From Swiss-Prot:
<keyword id="KW-0285">Flavoprotein</keyword>
<dbReference type="GO" id="GO:0019825">
    <property type="term" value="F:oxygen binding"/>
</dbReference>
<comment type="function">
    <text>Is involved in NO detoxification in an aerobic process, termed nitric oxide dioxygenase (NOD) reaction that utilizes O(2) and NAD(P)H to convert NO to nitrate, which protects the bacterium from various noxious nitrogen compounds. Therefore, plays a central role in the inducible response to nitrosative stress.</text>
</comment>
<dbReference type="InterPro" id="IPR017927">
    <property type="entry name" value="FAD-bd_FR_type"/>
</dbReference>
<keyword id="KW-0520">NAD</keyword>
<feature type="binding site">
    <location>
        <position position="188"/>
    </location>
    <ligand>
        <name>FAD</name>
    </ligand>
</feature>
<feature type="domain" description="Globin">
    <location>
        <begin position="1"/>
        <end position="136"/>
    </location>
</feature>
<comment type="similarity">
    <text>Belongs to the globin family. Two-domain flavohemoproteins subfamily.</text>
</comment>
<feature type="active site" description="Charge relay system">
    <location>
        <position position="135"/>
    </location>
</feature>
<dbReference type="GO" id="GO:0046872">
    <property type="term" value="F:metal ion binding"/>
</dbReference>
<dbReference type="GO" id="GO:0009636">
    <property type="term" value="P:response to toxic substance"/>
</dbReference>
<dbReference type="InterPro" id="IPR023950">
    <property type="entry name" value="Hmp"/>
</dbReference>
<dbReference type="InterPro" id="IPR008333">
    <property type="entry name" value="Cbr1-like_FAD-bd_dom"/>
</dbReference>
<feature type="site" description="Influences the redox potential of the prosthetic heme and FAD groups">
    <location>
        <position position="386"/>
    </location>
</feature>
<dbReference type="InterPro" id="IPR001433">
    <property type="entry name" value="OxRdtase_FAD/NAD-bd"/>
</dbReference>
<feature type="domain" description="FAD-binding FR-type">
    <location>
        <begin position="150"/>
        <end position="255"/>
    </location>
</feature>
<feature type="active site" description="Charge relay system">
    <location>
        <position position="95"/>
    </location>
</feature>
Amino acid sequence: MLSENTINIVKSTAPLLAETGPKLTAHFYQRMFEHNPELKDIFNMSNQRNGDQREALFNAICAYASNIDNLPALLGAVEKIAHKHSSFLITADQYQIVGSHLLATIDELFSPGQAVLDAWAEAYGVLANVFIQREEQIYQANQSQTGGWRGLREFELVEKQYESAHICSFVFKPVDGGSVVSFKPGQYLGIYINDEQFENQEIRQYSLSSSVRPDCYRISVKREEGGRVSNYLHDHLDVGSKVKLAAPAGDFFLDAAPTAPVVLISAGVGLTPTLSMLESLTEHQAPVTWIHATENGQQHAFKQHVKQLVETHPHFNSLVWYNQPNSDDKIGDDFQFSGWVNLHEIETVLKQADVQVYFCGPVGFMQFIAKQLLEMGVPEQQFHYECFGPHKVV
């Protein structure tokens, strides 16, 4: 429990932090990696270079400072971050390292005096304990389930298949021959890459792209321009290759009542978590609407698979948008609409009181979808989204 004095001091520093901007977290990361270079094996250095991680941490620090007297308002963010941390196998000792560099950063940038530093130390300690306890719960839950494990487990790539021009699926089975822990449709898998071509260990999270299977996991990865790990997986990971995986995690998952209509919306490789959901809804008691947007037929992943699912399950419906169809893309067969997704095409579904909407794709696409949902009166608590990479609010 934080003292009133600590709460007041931390809240009073919030405007100063906001004014400083991501310069605060840039200084923090530079300091931490200089003194603790081993942490480069944990953090995604690509997100450091493009500034996404600095921005995400800055937003989190400002949110904590502003809501320190209303911690329940942060529970959603805590859950999201705790799941991501569990995929990175974050430990309690690492929270101490981060805390020491955060306090040193505040001191070096602002020289606020010992009272402010003590207040931030107390506030950080409380927040760190919340994360440590929640992450321990996640670790124990994964370990205690059938097929579960804690830490890393070695898997072998047993199948590699291209789903479109840029998206490739990878199926992994455990080397020990055992079963694998179940997951909730929409969650992701942590993959650890150690290769001499990389200066540091590279860790990435990729959405599981199929329904639950007892002995394997499937991820489907888009080759990103300049993407170190995605290109490595496409070009160098072959059937028979071994990788180490962390157990499934993530707070974005299918959680709809059996009688609630479900709408799954995706763009590009954002279909990976929603495809896992679709495959898991074959026995659902209410209509399921699949909406997917992509550039054209060449980039349309899982086209035949989804078409077959829709044809064999009467409660499934599919609408596809191509942004720039090729000359051989057939409207009415390959896709139904061109241009940007217009949710008014399913307005009747979205007007149902208990509808649940799940969407994933580029941030701009998700902002566009969220805007339409709000304009159509869909309550915020009934739509759910996933950002690939550091979280952004849409």
